[in-house]
Amino acid sequence: MLQGRREAKKSYALFSSTFFFFFICFLSSSSAELTDKGVNFEVVALIGIKSSLTDPHGVLMNWDDTAVDPCSWNMITCSDGFVIRLEAPSQNLSGTLSSSIGNLTNLQTVLLQNNYITGNIPHEIGKLMKLKTLDLSTNNFTGQIPFTLSYSKNLQYLRVNNNSLTGTIPSSLANMTQLTFLDLSYNNLSGPVPRSLAKTFNVMGNSQICPTGTEKDCNGTQPKPMSITLNSSQNKSSDGGTKNRKIAVVFGVSLTCVCLLIIGFGFLLWWRRRHNKQVLFFDINEQNKEEMCLGNLRRFNFKELQSATSNFSSKNLVGKGGFGNVYKGCLHDGSIIAVKRLKDINNGGGEVQFQTELEMISLAVHRNLLRLYGFCTTSSERLLVYPYMSNGSVASRLKAKPVLDWGTRKRIALGAGRGLLYLHEQCDPKIIHRDVKAANILLDDYFEAVVGDFGLAKLLDHEESHVTTAVRGTVGHIAPEYLSTGQSSEKTDVFGFGILLLELITGLRALEFGKAANQRGAILDWVKKLQQEKKLEQIVDKDLKSNYDRIEVEEMVQVALLCTQYLPIHRPKMSEVVRMLEGDGLVEKWEASSQRAETNRSYSKPNEFSSSERYSDLTDDSSVLVQAMELSGPR
């Protein structure tokens, strides 16, 4: 009996000590990401980044220093509770990049391009051992390229072009075996160019670099601008002299010709840079692999997407459009995706052209743009993979319950406007959407507007000339000049955005405007008439009841009518549209447009339908336009 009690005590003691040991281990592991005050290290690091930046649009507003978990913050993506992506491109951020970024040791992607960030690139970035993509291009960074970047052994994609970096290119970059894309162009770099293992290596626009790649050759030589691909081994210099003068002359003439060719090629690249804004260097030697990376894109295996969507089951069909059907899918790691199965793939160009266009689309990264996650191509299929937007599209939400409140509709309008502004004026190369409508504006988990389907029109039309003649769009949203001539421009998108604003205000689809018994005429006629008669309450979505600001509705209607003027030259640019939605410059624009319409009417003879009256959208020409749209049928 006594012996049994002793054994029981021993067992209890052993159990207690074991439990205590594992409890201590648990506390140790759970506190690995916490400071001694119980604060998440990643929160501290991100707040450090926020405090060193100036954020004019408040995109980092929900970065809260009292939070325990940063995974719900804007611009942040997490996996297994750790921050793996920091993406805030084209947000007008200024200030400096804090060294605390080095404490985000699980980061895989950093996208801060197209901002106004100054100062040095922090050396602490070299602590990010899991980093694969780093894009700091088109900022105002100064100082030298940190040699510590070479410590990030997994880095595959590095862009620091279009800054004001100085000094030499670190020779340690030559040791980065995973690096496939390196763009150092348009800085103030000097000295020799080290041999790089990157398949695509751009150093164009650095006037003080040396073309031969050795320090010795930099002394006493005139530096030359250059843009090169450094995959082949450098030619070994010959130790022996020429045998006779004839060989020397031939060699000299040949060398001169080669130099002239190099200079001509450099001038051609410079000219393309000036006219196209970007020269894409693209390599697709591994296109036959089942899975690979293309810049920031992942190439999926077709069977993987087939499995994720249950063989593209109709149960997973979440959308249909002019470019193809969209299916909801679930990958093996639990990620929810949206797979767009493109139509008309035989009308486009070849595989290389298709993937080049995809690369260009993937470079368009903005808070209000749907990020392209990956793609899949076979001999008969082309599929695009996107993150899944759980709240659907604006078109579907306008018909759903609970009703979208007025504040959310305003935020959607501004977000969609900023996305289009980026495509038109900040993206490189610029992109015309060509099918702006409520169904192509998606909503994320926080009901922020995300513009989708951008770039797809060009993706399927790249065999045609730069002036597209095939009209791609949706009836009711197509600008008159695009419908009649097939020529699209940024102003084509502005017209579609104006219709989108009216859809947000009324809760109706474009072709539903003005179809009620007491609303004869088409959308713009109906809206203008009620606006002139100060009867805007008849325009507003009945589901909103009286829960809206009348002045704000009137202002948004005015912006919509300015966007939908008949002549493209009279429509504002998207940068002007965004400013007007933010409350700046609307009064002046509206008065100028009204005066122009009044002038047009004063020059028209009575009972004569003049061209000036016909083509001013503040006159009664809209019904003709919509009739033409309806007759054109779906495309």
Curated annotation (Swiss-Prot):
Biased composition (Polar residues): 219-241, 593-613
Extracellular side: 33-248
Glycosylation sites: N92, N103, N140, N162, N175, N188, N219, N231, N235
Location of the region described as Disordered in the Swiss-Prot/TrEMBL record: 214-242, 593-621
Enzyme Commission numbers on file: 2.7.11.1
Binding site for ATP: V318, G319, K320, G321, G322, F323, G324, N325, V326, K340
Compartment(s) where it occurs, according to its Swiss-Prot or TrEMBL record: Cell membrane
Record entry for activity regulation: Inhibited by the viral nuclear shuttle protein (NSP) that binds to the region required for oligomerization.
Active site positions, chain numbering: D435
LRR repeats: 104-128, 129-153, 155-176, 177-200
Family listed: Belongs to the protein kinase superfamily. Ser/Thr protein kinase family.
Subunit comment: Oligomer. Interacts with geminivirus nuclear shuttle protein (NSP).
Name of the protein described by the UniProt record: Protein NSP-INTERACTING KINASE 2
UniProt source species: Arabidopsis thaliana
Lineage, uppermost ranks: Eukaryota, Viridiplantae, Streptophyta, Embryophyta, Tracheophyta
